[in-house]
């Protein structure tokens, strides 16, 4: 039988079919008790016949069989442990010279230039090429290099070009865009993309201060509807993989806040110095909340950021405040020696003796200074006024509160204002906390004086004030002066406001006050538009007593502002404008003054001074003029106002409401009050597993 089989392999190899080979090999292995799985272990019989060349050797005495791979020597048939006993009768390499081979190689199609008429060029090896469409760049297998298959692709995928001749495709092939090498494109998996999208949505939820449930209840359904209308339902279903449950959004926000905090700590560790701004207030649940902001130089600018937002567990004393800040510093290994200034308001918990926070900070940071909010100084200064004007202000507030404290009265006033065609339909509430809006409150009251005269009950004791022209003249003046003071106050708020900015505004206000007082003495009221229009309306003049009270108020206001903002010889004037310095400033040593001379002699630096803000100008010179630039930045680092803390508590109150009393608002404040954008890609890379489950 063996001789018969070898004869068939020798003389009839060209006429064999795979079925005959398989049948005879099976019979041979069965007769000689050989494991058939050795021949078929690597896959199907078709794959074995195409990949291997079997060599069967027959010896008349022991009938040993050898199997030898012809080309793919790295593919060795694997043998199970159960066949080890029979492996002695199988040789993979035979030393016998009596070897007859049988092989079948896969067919390789060649590329023909005529295939370009179907819009196809070749890709890869010229001997074994793949077909590539010149229109859509799709790559087909070697077996697709047939005119019928190429024509089918052109007619089905690019029917608009099926009648084009070969010159069209040749021109398209030779275009510069097609000659560019293919760029590998890294595509995220669905889980990775869904996780990143979840972080992005959570980031915007935290920025808006909305509840976590808005992600699953509103954002995801809206996103699905938009995608379904703009694309199709298949893409809309992919949005289901984005995790936006309540707990998931909460975890995402904590991860984002942690990433921002990590970046901030790294910046503070490498910066030259920083200043602090701190304040404390109570939230809706009664907890004392501490907000601390930090101001530091990073790259070529001065940045402001939230350092920490913590709830004080015990009494909100200075010692407790200091311990909270100090714990954060020690935990993150931030050096206190870099602190140059601490800004606070004038409350007892924020400033005081050794036991208070500012003093304790100055104890661990000996070179640090302390400063008070300049807006608070301004608020104290404007409270001083003559008795006649103070009485009018108090009576105006009583009229407003009489209506605003009674909802029914407010509704009736609204109806009356609408019927009379008034521009406004409600009064503005005045409180001591909202002193910044006092000008708007008085202006609104004066504008609705006619409607209030009709509305007010004659039994109300202050109803006669609305018919008293002297009272209305004083009210018009107060509305004008408080509007002007509010405008000055608002101009001193915002980010990156320096001490120079505040004192410049105060200097301007002092000059205006003297000008206004002189104008009133000359009975010229053009500086006060509301008062001037009212005088024109009633065709009257201002009584001398009223003029005297106005002049007294303006001069007294100027004197009070000079007390809180004294005009002194500024030793840091060279920081404000280094190009006006002609004599060595007392605050600079000789070496720094020489550097300042070099700086002011540079024409490019002079041009940048007119283009950049003061903070950015000095920060950009750190590399070129390090000594004098660092001294200037140190002068610019202290906070001038408590604007950031006031804004922060407003955001805190809007985030942690009575409906969300159990919320940990610290991560939300970190995201909402920070200028640092979290690195979502870095956060996702830290996740070892990215599941689409909630």
UniProtKB/Swiss-Prot annotation:
GO terms for molecular function: DNA binding; zinc ion binding. May be derived from an ancient transposon that has lost its ability to translocate. InterPro entries: RNaseH-like_sf (IPR012337), Znf_BED (IPR003656). Zn(2+) binds at residues 133, 136, 153, 158. It comes from the Eukaryota. Keywords: Metal-binding, Zinc, Zinc-finger. Pfam families: zf-BED. Transmembrane segments: none annotated. PANTHER family: EPM2A-INTERACTING PROTEIN 1, LOW QUALITY PROTEIN: ZINC FINGER BED DOMAIN-CONTAINING PROTEIN 5-LIKE. This is Zinc finger BED domain-containing protein 5. A zinc finger (BED-type) spans 109-165.
